[in-house]
Design a protein with these regions (language model features):
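N-terminal targeting sequences that direct proteins away from the cytosol to non-cytosolic compartments
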Residues: 1-162, 171-217
């Protein structure tokens, strides 16, 4: 599935550059943005409909559909509360699998800072809160340009840890940054999802001029 929505701080502005994310709909679903007006955009309605679709070819026990819908709705509510302007995708390979795992993708206007320093700031590559030195790798994108990938562990509740992957790219044409973030306490879930997350990272791009009209035909 290739989805495109306006990006930028003014997400409803039709002149804003569109961000395209090519994802596998068999393992990902996208939380409807808060500004979408379709009747399914209310999280309770959306999560129940999506849960019913996920269980369609399975044999759910009583309450399974509703329980999975609650998980989806909870993840969507957290995403909308913490990053209301971002795209939120949930890693949902199977309704019985662990998760869902949320990946947020956002576009940020450039600040008065060198791109190399800004990428380190966005990815928290030098953050002192990490329990050990973050692992920092160059992660260039064929469409977005130079970027970084940072994996880090930070203190969580009750002496637990949160594990985080952060990607950021500088897109010179729009003088903007694309930021992709996921965080979870479930390291096994994160590791299992890394191939799909890496694919998301490499497939994210801006809509080319005139491409929207072609996609709508």
């Amino acid at each position: 599935v290739t989805e495109t929505t306006p990006s930028w701080e003014h997400a409803n502005d039709e002149t804003a550059p569109g961000l395209v994310i090519d994802y596998d709909a068999s393992v990902w679903c996208e939380v409807p943005p808060m500004w979408v007006e379709e009747d399914w955009a209310e999280l309770g309605t959306w999560s129940l409909r999506f849960s019913e679709l996920c269980w369609e070819h399975e044999d759910p026990a009583p309450g399974d559909v509703e329980a999975y819908a609650d998980q989806l709705r909870g993840a969507g509510e957290i995403a909308q509360a913490h990053a209301p302007g971002a795209r939120a995708l949930l890693y949902t390979p199977h309704p019985r699998a662990r998760g869902p795992l949320t990946v947020l993708v956002d576009v940020l206007p450039a600040e008065d800072m060198e791109p190399a320093a800004a990428l380190r700031l966005l990815t928290l590559a030098d953050d002192d809160d990490a329990v050990r030195a973050p692992v920092v790798d160059a992660f260039p994108s064929p469409d977005l340009g130079d970027g970084l990938r940072v994996s880090r562990a930070i203190p969580g509740d009750e002496d637990g840890l949160f594990f985080q992957l952060r990607y950021a790219w500088y897109y010179e044409e729009y003088d903007a940054y694309v930021l992709m973030v996921t965080i979870t306490h479930d390291l096994e879930l994160l590791i299992s999802a890394i191939p799909e997350i890496e694919y998301l990272a490499m497939s994210t791009r801006f809509l080319e001029p005139g491409e929207a009209e072609v996609m709508d035909e």
